[in-house]
Amino acid sequence: MSIPTGFPSTNGRDGWANFDQATGFERELLDILRSARQSGAVNLFWITTDVHFAEAFRYTPFADAPEFHVYEIATGPMNSGIFPNRDFDPTLSPERLAFVGPGAATDVTTWEQAKSWFNFGTLEIDADGTLDAAIVDTSGDRRFELELQPSSR
């Protein structure tokens, strides 16, 4: 949600992060989040992919509702160019929980180095509603884990 996507940026963006673009996407996202908040939701979980690194965020988009959080995990792709981007849109008060990637694409010069950054995400919801999400590398190691309990309304 906060990671600008679309390349080159002169072609526009295909995500909600507005950065230097004034688009309707951000307003649309805020409408969706307001609706979820009004329905009583407190923990939303978003899955995004194809950003060429992995990252996890927790958002607290409404100052008057600190219990309302949105979580996002972005992963992958599993075997592609690595283009880490540490910039993100601060509009929804994001807190970065994890970043899995090199400092810069130029830091990766060999196949062995590249393999350490390839990743995918997993998501499991057990019978009691506990959500377990993870960023996993090609060795099967969990580089980041997040567990969310279902809310009681």
Label for each model-derived stretch:
Residues M1-R153:
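Long, structured stretches of catalytic cores involved in phosphate-ester chemistry, encompassing
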